[in-house]
């Protein structure tokens, strides 16, 4: 949650895949109820379960759709999982709203502050900025390559009215921005005492947990977890696909990921 990459530069992974109770899970009605079951499987002793439940009750409150997700059937055997009803219309709102809530909870408990430092040419930046903007213990610095994003994403990142948000336009490419961020995580010399440096891209496992929840939710709504589904996932990186794979390792019936 608070470290991003492991000390050896690798990614954090669970020691084991927690298994779900299909008979219990298939009867849950709402996305929040699914999240209340899935998320505590990963928090272990780091957080009290009642604190996690309270946190989840207050996360994703700014989504347009009442149950956060809408599933539209377009053919007898084909449905569309609409993940764009969050505040920035990106599927990343699910993982980043959850991550920001856990960041804030941890920082408040430890009486510390944090800097979110990231690079983006798309929806990660706007989703991260929106997720963190109201938490005074988190300052967000997001590097954006000049001229390399859509107009709506530029506006999402540069018009947020919050003293905690600092979008920075860089005269360079996305790779240039990413290099600056990587060097920052290596040095960390600019950090104050009792201050974390946080990653918000898909290396942060909490983002994956948030996305695991909507794969289980969709499988419950479509066939009550009774038979394997195929998921076709438009994605720019492997994070969203990996969340689907992780759900299958936990017990969600899965045929293919396309």
Regions found by a protein language model. Give the residues of each.
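PLP-dependent amino-acid enzyme catalytic core
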Residues: 1-258
């Amino acid at each position: 949650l608070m470290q991003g990459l492991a000390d050896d530069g690798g990614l954090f992974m669970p020691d084991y895949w927690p298994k779900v109770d299909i008979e219990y899970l298939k009867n849950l009605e709402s996305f929040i109820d699914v999240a209340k079951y899935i998320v505590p499987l990963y928090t272990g002793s780091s957080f009290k379960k009642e604190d996690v439940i309270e946190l989840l009750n207050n996360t994703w409150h700014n989504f347009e759709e009442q149950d956060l997700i809408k599933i539209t059937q377009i053919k007898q055997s084909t449905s569309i999982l609409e993940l764009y009803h969050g505040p920035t219309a990106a599927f990343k709102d699910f993982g980043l709203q959850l991550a920001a809530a856990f960041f804030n909870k941890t920082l408040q408990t430890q009486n510390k502050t944090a800097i979110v430092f990231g690079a983006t040419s798309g929806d990660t930046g706007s989703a991260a900025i929106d997720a963190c903007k109201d938490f005074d213990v988190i300052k967000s610095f997001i590097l954006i390559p000049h001229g390399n994003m859509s107009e709506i994403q530029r506006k999402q990142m540069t018009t947020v009215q919050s003293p905690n948000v600092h979008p920075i336009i860089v005269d360079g490419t996305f790779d240039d921005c990413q290099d600056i961020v990587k060097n920052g995580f290596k040095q960390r010399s600019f950090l104050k005492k009792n201050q974390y440096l946080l990653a918000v891209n898909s290396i942060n496992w909490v983002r994956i947990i948030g996305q695991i929840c909507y794969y289980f939710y969709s499988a419950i709504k479509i066939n009550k977890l009774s038979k394997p589904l195929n998921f076709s996932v438009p994605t720019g990186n492997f994070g969203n696909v990996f969340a689907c794979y992780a759900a299958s390792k936990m017990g969600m019936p899965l045929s293919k990921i396309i």
